[in-house]
Amino acid sequence: MKNDKLVNILAPLCLHLESASPTVHIVKATPDMYDKVGLLEEEQQIHKAVKKRQREFRAGRQSAREAIKRLVSNDSELAQVPILSGKAREPLFPSLISGSISHTDSLCLAACALKSEVPSLGIDVENNTSLASHLFSSIYTQSEKALMETSNTLPDALIFSIKESLFKCLYPFVQVYFDFLDAQITLQPDAENAGQFHFELIGENRTLLQANLPNLSFHGHYCFTEQYVFSLCFFSS
């Protein structure tokens, strides 16, 4: 899949907003990025990892660096800051950048924005395949399960993807793991295969999580094709 085709597919997600504010850049890893050796500190983090993990890690960092270059073309040094992994295996971007990385077996995406405009963001891509029925109760709330049961078009992986991107977006603020069932998702379709989403924190962790969230505008977007499910969310200043 070429980058220009990818951008067209992801247009409903607003992932390439060069003329808008806030600007979010997304980059799809090219085949060479999977085997391109990264910065020394990055390589030290993965030298004991299996080959598959090393390739995914490198592709994510290389695509993230390309997104940073497009975002701040006048600061080439910023793109040479190592993107290491935090305690939750989250990528640690340069202090001026908010970013997120996601991958399947065949696709790797990185999204970046200026932290002054977008304090936090999360991106996720999943294969558009069926979920095992025994997983539904650990991912879907009753409301979400009812929505999926009455829809003939929504992919099984959509709510899963949305909650993955939501975790990435919220984690920098809450700094704790939270469960799939701690958030309830509502969809606002803009088209048959794309739209916006909103979330509500529920469950026994609600008060703790809510207390650490910023008082900022939240934006959630999703779309899907026959092959992939995409989601993106971010807070904007």
Predicted features and spans:
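Core catalytic alpha/beta fold that binds nucleotide/phospho-ligands
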Residues: 1-237
